[in-house]
Amino acid sequence: MTTAAAAWFAVVFFLLPGFLVAWVAGLRVPAAVTTALPVTFGVIGVSSWMWGVTSAPFNLWTFGVSMVLALAVAGGWRYAFARKARRGGDVPWHRALFPGKVEWTHWGIPFVGVAVAAWMAVTDRLSWLAQMPNGADNIVQGWDSQWHANAVRFVMETGVASSTRMGELQNFETHARLFYPSGFHAGVALFAEAAGLEPIRAVNIASTVLPAVALPLTMV
């Protein structure tokens, strides 16, 4: 997969799960899009912890199970509010499940701005990476980048992504307990597995795409 294709794939991969959960829970499409990224990582964070207390590895299959559970909870949440809205029988089910309407004219320009800003940020960073030795496979020579790449590789190789079990990586000799927020690393590990990327390349692409998409979305 080329770097550009992987970047486009990352946009869909990180936005789609959160969008589906937010929309099923009752948000309208524009609001579901704007909240998609934090919802995705919320599901990933809870999922990685949940599977960390079992013997099952955290990977695309177990995350898929978590998505089914999240969608079921979101659907139950929406149904409960729709049922409450229908008390008395005056409101039809469709109206109760999909109240109001979306004024697309109010959302069009902001979303165009988000798309343009994200595209500019991603293309600038990817162009910079392309000029480096080994391109997107080049790791920045700093503690943070190396730690993040190591954490992603650890998740991919062991299936351990729980934030309460990061001592198994950082305290390699003793495995002393350590809490470290690992939602980013769990998400990037899933992305790398789905796209067939090595950890360093996945970290570089995800570190480019995620802030480029998240920052303009916060301004909508």
Which stretches of residues belong to each language-model region?
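Active-site lumenal/periplasmic loops and adjacent helix-entry segments of GT-C-fold
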Residues: I109, A117-V220
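Lipid-exposed faces of alpha-helical membrane segments in multi-pass integral membrane proteins
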Residues: V39, V43, S47, V65, ...
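Membrane-embedded, hydrophobic transmembrane alpha-helices
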Residues: M1-W107
